[in-house]
């Protein structure tokens, strides 16, 4: 199992979020998710300015195996997207918790963070999926 950074929160659907000061939330997909999908070939990013509700579809990633919706872990406005992924979707495969981030959301309801999984809770989800 891959190392899971301790400063992240997760959804059961394998999205991660890193909370920064000033209510900014950086969002990506977990190493587990990119491993399951295999080599990514396309990323459909949200538009800057899009309003997203927590749990709503925010982006789509496609691999040689399948397409997968990416869900927003928090409610807010998209203020930045990782345009590198348009030309190099494999960046998610290479560095899912770093350069492979997907978007930055300005959170409207920071208290939603308490609904997300801690790294330990996410590890338990992965372990229960394997059995």
UniProtKB/Swiss-Prot annotation:
GO terms for biological process: glycine decarboxylation via glycine cleavage system. One of its GO terms (cellular component) is cytosol. The modification N6-lipoyllysine is found at residue 65. Its cofactor is (R)-lipoate. The keyword Cytoplasm does not apply. It comes from the Bacteria. PANTHER family: GLYCINE CLEAVAGE SYSTEM H PROTEIN, GLYCINE CLEAVAGE SYSTEM H PROTEIN-RELATED. This is Glycine cleavage system H protein. It comes from Xylella fastidiosa (strain Temecula1 / ATCC 700964). The gene is gcvH.
């Amino acid at each position: 199992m891959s190392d899971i950074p301790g400063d992240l929160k997760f959804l059961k659907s394998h999205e991660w979020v890193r909370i920064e000061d000033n209510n900014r939330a950086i969002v990506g997909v977990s190493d587990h998710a990119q491993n399951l999908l295999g080599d990514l070939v396309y990323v459909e990013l949200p538009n800057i300015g899009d309003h997203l509700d927590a749990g709503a579809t925010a982006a789509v990633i496609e691999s040689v195996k399948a397409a997968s919706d990416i869900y927003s872990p928090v409610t807010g406005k998209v203020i930045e997207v990782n345009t590198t992924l348009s030309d190099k979707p494999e960046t998610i495969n290479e560095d899912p918790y770093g350069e492979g981030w997907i978007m930055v959301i300005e959170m409207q309801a920071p208290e939603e963070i308490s609904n997300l999984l801690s790294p330990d809770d996410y590890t338990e989800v992965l372990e229960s999926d394997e059995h």
